[in-house]
Amino acid sequence: MRIGHGYDVHRFGEGDYITLGGVRIPHKHGLVAHSDGDVLLHALSDALLGAAALGDIGKHFPDTDPRFKGADSRALLRHVVAIVAEKGWKVGNVDATIVAQAPKMAPHIETMRGLIAEDLGVALDQVNVKATTTERLGFTGREEGIAVHAVALLMAR
């Protein structure tokens, strides 16, 4: 078994929605990113790659590569799962914490879990997503952006 940790941050910018866990959520701002800015899936991808000792998403999908401009992070996550599987690993479970003052995540968590489970090829009970605020402290509390921490457990295939 192997454990990996992922962390990602994106700042708010222009737009009227964000994409988290594959779910489009209306919001007064968008997230600034080279891809679709899905900070949740980026952190999960990093956790999976880290557990398999395969670097991070920047190594596999550099933001300097125009092929990944506006990329669908669900497709990137599925590619990460394939890379990890090629090295002999399968997902045991994943757990993520979204750190954001706004928008409210609770109405979207179950949909996120379902999409992530689908992309990972695992059962719903192998995926956990939760959200918290920082009580208006720091950059997330000032609503300047969103951060996500994620952990992944990999098991030998």
From Swiss-Prot:
Keywords: Isoprene biosynthesis, Lyase, Metal-binding. Binds 1 divalent metal cation per subunit. PROSITE patterns: ISPF. A divalent metal cation binds at residues 8, 10, 42. Its cofactor is a divalent metal cation. GO terms for biological process: isopentenyl diphosphate biosynthetic process, methylerythritol 4-phosphate pathway; terpenoid biosynthetic process. Homotrimer. Belongs to the IspF family. Involved in the biosynthesis of isopentenyl diphosphate (IPP) and dimethylallyl diphosphate (DMAPP), two major building blocks of isoprenoid compounds. Catalyzes the conversion of 4-diphosphocytidyl-2-C-methyl-D-erythritol 2-phosphate (CDP-ME2P) to 2-C-methyl-D-erythritol 2,4-cyclodiphosphate (ME-CPP) with a corresponding release of cytidine 5-monophosphate (CMP). This is 2-C-methyl-D-erythritol 2,4-cyclodiphosphate synthase. It comes from Pseudomonas paraeruginosa (strain DSM 24068 / PA7) (Pseudomonas aeruginosa (strain PA7)). The lineage of its organism: Bacteria, Pseudomonadati, Pseudomonadota, Gammaproteobacteria, Pseudomonadales.
